[in-house]
């Protein structure tokens, strides 16, 4: 059995094109009218015969063109009527189906607060409203609305049996003297099939105090039986004041993969610490990256989020923010799957200079550990952040910051390659004592496969 799909809009467009063809035929008929009354060039028989030939040809052309024009008009009329008929039939068929669906959803909605079939409504931005849940049988969760200043983002709605979870809303920027608001969590995926929603990003910290840290990213939503976990939201940048920077927010953790099949979600990146432009105590620290979610039976582990960078100092003196820690990679599936890579540690901020004693450089953040695996390759450890330079000074320069430690590579239980260890961060030096390089991470072990390589130690300043 064969089927024909009809788009009423395309049929109407074709009818309009055919009407333009008819207009062109009428124009040709008008131009041919002049050739039906050709005068003889002279009084001889040859000229008279030639004039009669052209006149007869023009008359025959007009007769044929009249028939074509009549056919074309009937074709355009039929095509236009067909387009209208299809459009009416389509609207008529949609209305009963919608009425049937409404009749089914109405009692379920009134009893449970969510429909049987249908997507959840999105939360309104600027209100932090949560997204609506999807239908019990079929439907995606709605996205959470973003938060107003000082207000957390709304959580994403959950799916029912089949569907994807909604994304969490972004957190609002912090009010003066307050921290940034957290991002909303992603909604859960369908119990049978569907991915978890992504977490919302954290808001920027408010002004006026070094306690106004950036908002934390929302966690990614978990999958059900089959599906991928949602990605964690990014942490917000720290706020503060010109002489005291606030720390960045932490990245959200990734959602868990499906119990049967599905990758776990990546951890969210951390927010950076705020710098200072006037003399004060310190700039902000970088936030920590989010950890990847866990994996079920079959699937790859997610990657850990990167740590945030410490805030810079552009004033004469002030402490430098340390880099944040990278998130850990997720483990591979219990039966099969690769482990996720650890996130990189954040770099320390850059210091200013003073006329007497220089400030010390900040330490780099450590890299996250790679995920383990049973059958599959283990994840590599994350690289550490570099230590910050010590500040120059007229008398004694500041000490360089130490590099962070590289993350350890993941191990393999049965078959696969062990993960490589992350590289240690380099120490820094300006005029004071040098910073020490961070140690590299250990390589992961493997039962039936090559072990991972150890990470390189960071160079001393």
From Swiss-Prot:
Reactions it catalyzes: hexadecanal + NADP(+) + CoA = hexadecanoyl-CoA + NADPH + H(+)
EC number: 1.2.1.n2
Subcellular localization(s) per the UniProt record: Cell membrane; Secreted, Cell wall; Host mitochondrion
Compositionally skewed regions (Gly residues) per UniProt: 434-446
Domain of life of the organism encoding this protein: Bacteria
Any one GO cellular component localisation term in the record: extracellular region
Keywords (A to Z) from UniProt: Cell membrane, Cell wall, Host mitochondrion, Membrane, Oxidoreductase, Secreted, Virulence
PE domain span: 4-92
Chain spans, region Disordered: 232-251, 426-461
Function: May be an effector protein that contributes to pathogenesis by targeting host mitochondria, where it modulates host cellular processes. In THP1 macrophages, increases the ADP-to-ATP ratio and increases the cellular ROS levels. Also induces mitochondrial perturbations through membrane depolarization, release of mitochondrial superoxide, up-regulation of expression of host proapoptotic proteins (BAX and BIM) and release of cytochrome C into the cytosol. May bind calcium to increase intracellular calcium influx, which may further lead to mitochondrial perturbations. In vitro, shows NADPH-dependent fatty acyl coenzyme A oxidoreductase activity. Can oxidize palmitoyl-CoA, but not glutathione and thiourea.
Family according to the record: Belongs to the mycobacterial PE family. PGRS subfamily.
Name of the molecule in the record: PE-PGRS family protein PE_PGRS45
Provenance organism: Mycobacterium tuberculosis (strain ATCC 25618 / H37Rv)
Top-level taxonomy: Bacteria, Bacillati, Actinomycetota, Actinomycetes, Mycobacteriales
